[in-house]
């Protein structure tokens, strides 16, 4: 019988059996049951074209506060979008502003920069923990449903600087950020048409100095898998 405690690590924090970090261990349904070895290789899933589409962070094995970039978790709701060359990337600000604004990558980087260290966790991280804790469900897979948690240093331009350049008004209540990744979520109703991933921010949050348009992570320009060219 499984017990809640085994030494210093509670059962619900134990990792899945360590079978290495080779994506070939994913079964035919695409589920990944491995955990990285102590060399801290990330747990990854690949798409049909051999591109990494998901990473889980080995939180219990890390040293220090900053998660290395290649171990920083990723979650994909849609397919990974095509790479946008730097000279073709644009940021458009429109709606309830005095002056609609379009910036290319070089123009965005002319704004004063700011670096922010922050902890990020997916809202779905360990979603089934409490069912297990109340003996109402099986032990969650650490690599499937948890360890979607990382810390990084992000460098970019405060969103407030760009919004102020466009000129917000009394009617500017929310910011709707629309990304470049397009698709249909697995949980969407039948007949849902593809759409671009988007998120909303109250204007107070958008104007916070730590809300930035990041173009670098951990001292290097953003990688495509982590949101390049720019990540909000």
Regions picked out by a protein language model, each given a short descriptive name:
Residues 2-231:
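Structured, non-membrane catalytic/scaffold regions adjacent to prosthetic-group chemistry
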């Amino acid at each position: 019988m499984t017990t809640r405690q085994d030494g210093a690590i509670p059962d619900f924090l134990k990792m899945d059996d360590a079978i290495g970090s080779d994506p070939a261990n994913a079964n035919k349904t695409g589920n990944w049951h491995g955990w990285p070895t102590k060399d801290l290789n990330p747990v990854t899933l690949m798409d049909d074209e051999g591109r990494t589409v998901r990473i889980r962070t080995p939180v219990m094995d890390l040293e220090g506060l900053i998660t290395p970039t290649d171990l920083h978790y990723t979650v994909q709701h849609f397919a990974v979008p095509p790479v946008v060359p730097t000279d073709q990337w644009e940021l458009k600000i429109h709606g309830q502003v005095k002056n609609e604004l379009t910036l290319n990558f070089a123009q965005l980087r002319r704004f004063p920069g700011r670096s922010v260290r922050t902890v990020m966790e997916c809202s779905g991280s360990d979603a089934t923990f409490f069912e297990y804790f109340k003996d109402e469900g099986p032990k969650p897979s650490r690599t499937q449903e948890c360890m979607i948690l990382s810390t990084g240093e992000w460098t970019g331009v405060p969103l407030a600087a760009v919004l102020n350049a466009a000129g917000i008004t009394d009617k500017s209540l929310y910011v709707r950020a629309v990304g470049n990744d397009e698709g249909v979520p697995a949980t969407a109703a039948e007949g849902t048409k593809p759409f671009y991933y988007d998120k909303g921010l109250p204007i107070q949050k958008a104007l916070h100095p730590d809300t930035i348009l990041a173009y670098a992570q951990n001292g290097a320009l953003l990688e495509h898998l982590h949101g390049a060219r720019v990540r909000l």
